[in-house]
Amino acid sequence: MKKNFVSEKYVSNRTMPINLDPDHDILFRNEYQKNIEKSYYFNLNNILIANNHLFKSRFFSLEPQYFKMDTENWNSTLISIKQIRDTFLKGNKPESIEKGSWVIDDKSFNFFHFMTDVLSRISMIENELEEYPILLPNSFKNKNYILEVLNLLQIPTVFYDENKKYYIKELLITSHAAPAGNYNKYFINRVKNQFITDQILDHKKSYPK
């Protein structure tokens, strides 16, 4: 698996809030300085999507950090056994998708996570999206802000049915841009700039000043 790195590791230093109560400093002490690791993406062939989880060779769970926000209690062995059981009991034949990109986890439907985590992961692969459209579950269509952002930023997207299984012949998978609750400065600024282009500003001209 060849990782394509798209950002460098750096240390994010935060300034203490000016209204911080000294008695509360212990609550934030670990947040003043954070290591932001290198971000990357890679390609895998014949990946199975089932219940918004990723499996290789039909049954074996991919590393959870690519589709889970919190991996502390994740057990890949148990998930793989469950996948084997479900495959033989239900026997539903997976449908096929030629190419796609994976940019979500189990928190991505949330406004905050979509606007920061997901859009940062999309920004990492902006030059690959025409060939590898992002894959999103149909349930995301119920979130108007997601549809509006996808349309506004013209992000190529393929929606899939969460009740079905899919073989992705070639899947481009992104790392998280930063740990939960943190941001990679390269990508969050790129996302910001996408929202203030002339194209986006044109949508505001009809509003009264």
Predicted regions and their residues:
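The feature primarily captures lumenal catalytic ectodomains
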Residues: 1-209
